[in-house]
């Protein structure tokens, strides 16, 4: 799968998901390509999809960890995850982690065209849509490593977009109460 230019994490991931759906894959795995996600956790994530529709590599469950982040970044990440979990009523501790394994059969059940976030807010939005479809979630503890390549793309614009997405989804009139 090759795309010209950078169109955002959500856009890239949705293109990969559409490809997996069209080609009848069983499972699709997403992960960061900067070495912050250790491939050693891959088999545990895929194995978790035998019992769950979505397996999330989680920094925030027992056994999970973050390596080499300053305290303020850890606190901000935890606070944003708690806000997302509360506003969207998600049964997940790490809503913003991108290391995931999805059962393609469950992805096929949601309307991918309804997902509007193109940046990092996509991570919470797809979980919300899956939760609305009664997806079963599992969290697999991982250690998140400081990236070895590239720079963070998180910006004030991304943060504002995430908040706007949370508000849009939390107050959707067709939202199912949990």
Regions found by a protein language model. Name each.
Residues 1, 29-31, 55:
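Conserved Rossmann-like nucleotide-binding pocket used by diverse enzymes
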Residues 3-22, 39-120, 147-157, 161-163:
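Acceptor/aglycone-binding surface of glycosyltransferases and processive sugar-polymer synthases
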Residues 3-5, 31-33, 140:
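Cofactor-binding loops of NAD(P)H-dependent oxidoreductases
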Residues 25-36:
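Short beta-strand-to-loop acidic/aromatic patch adjacent to the donor-nucleotide binding site
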Residues 31, 58, 143:
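Conserved residues at the C-terminal ends of beta-strands
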Residues 35, 44, 124-125:
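An aromatic- and histidine-rich active-site surface loop
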Residues 40, 50, 105-106, 132-134, ...:
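Terminal low-complexity segments of carbohydrate-biosynthetic enzymes
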Residues 90-91, 114-116, 127-144:
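Catalytic donor-sugar/metal-binding loop of nucleotide-sugar-dependent glycosyltransferases
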